[in-house]
Amino acid sequence: MVKPLWVLAVALAGAGVVGAEGPGTGRNTPHEALKAYAAMDYTLAGKLARQIPDTPEGQLVAGLCDLYDRSRQDIGRGQLTLAELFYNEKMPLDYRLEAGVALARTAQLMKERRELYGDAGDRYDHEKIFRKVMAMAPGSSAARNAFLYLIRERLEDPAQQEAAFEELETFLRDFSGDPKLLPPIHLLAEYEYIRLKNDYKTAARHLQEGYEIGFANPSENRSGLFRLAFLYHKKIGDKPLAVKYYKEYLERYPYSGQAAVAQRFLEELGEGGK
């Protein structure tokens, strides 16, 4: 199964979102359990989590390790642990969000692989959980992740596609959090508008918005910029924007493998790369 967004564990630990240690636990055990999980040292993380079973950190890390540690995987137990944490309003919100996304995502994946899991994934309504996460913290990275997993699924269903595209646009328009969280949604939109609608203009708009915000991966910035120029050139026929982005590509990535292609396309457009 796909591993959870373990980077959040680092943020949680670094932010000091850890509970008080009980008798007999190590001084920094909650922090260390989160740190070990973030480093994907599941053996150590699980060991530390078992020392603090009554803390939010212990429950979160134990549940996640049960899901993702293949050496001692117990999906049913992990899902139950995370469900108890997610629905407990006394728990820290960040932990509930992480638990909810992991719980819903594993249930979703199990339903997609019924030949392996049968009806075990039906125990949890992943769409309901994803939407609850989105409602609990609308501008958070957890809400973004929940939406991304959910909208991909809806776009795969022909009966839901039109409504899904509307929901996608609404989510992006109304998102109240950090815009830097949105480029993955814009990339998905670019792909799906081309795949399902042959709508290159809307696809280019999403790619442009994602590029202007900035992609987390530098290689995605590079490939996205070239793709943007290519879409305006070959698919949309907008010469000014094609020229603009080809020139920007050559300025930023003059030694890349696609630089010669960008130069040739500029010459094709009568610009000569100048």
Residue ranges of model-derived segments:
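Specific register positions within alpha-helical solenoid repeats of the TPR/Sel1-like families, i.e.
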Residues: 37, 67, 104, 108-115, ...
